[in-house]
Amino acid sequence: MLRKFKISIDGKEYLVEMEEISESSVPAATPITPTTENTRAASDQKQQSQTPSPAATASAANTMPAPMPGTILKVLVNVGDTVSENQPLMILEAMKMENEIVAGMAGTVSAIHVSSGQTVNAGDNLITIA
């Protein structure tokens, strides 16, 4: 017997179907495709897309944000260094894996907002390229 549940994980709501299994029951023949109910997130996105934010300026585009929470292992560049697009800037450890943070554009490093060993959250400013 399939039963539907709505669960919330990190603020996102998911609609899931679960099958009750007993020793005498037979497993379902077809896999169930998960569906997402993001009504709150969708309405937030519509509001954001309708009103351009003043923070979306050229300087915001030059700042590299952390893609995920983790710890900065190494900073590979210094302020004043010239970098090319896709050049590794630093190493971020997340979930016991090392991830390269690469330059999204060519330019000169004008500021480094983190140091080795520092813990960062997703979206934190890491480095600014001018």
From Swiss-Prot:
Keyword hit for Lipid metabolism: yes
Organism lineage: Bacteria, Bacillati, Bacillota, Bacilli, Lactobacillales
InterPro entries documented for this protein: Biotin_BS, Biotin_Carboxyl_Carrier/Decarb, Biotin_lipoyl, Single_hybrid_motif
Record bears the keyword Lipid metabolism: yes
Keyword terms: Biotin, Fatty acid biosynthesis, Fatty acid metabolism, Lipid biosynthesis, Lipid metabolism
Designated name of the protein: Biotin carboxyl carrier protein
BP terms from Gene Ontology: fatty acid biosynthetic process
PROSITE patterns linked: BIOTIN (PS00188), BIOTINYL_LIPOYL (PS50968)
Listed Low complexity bias regions: 47-64
Region described as Disordered: spans on this chain: 20-64
Polar residues bias spans: 23-46
Residue list for modification N6-biotinyllysine: 96
Biotinyl-binding domain mapped to chain residues: 55-130
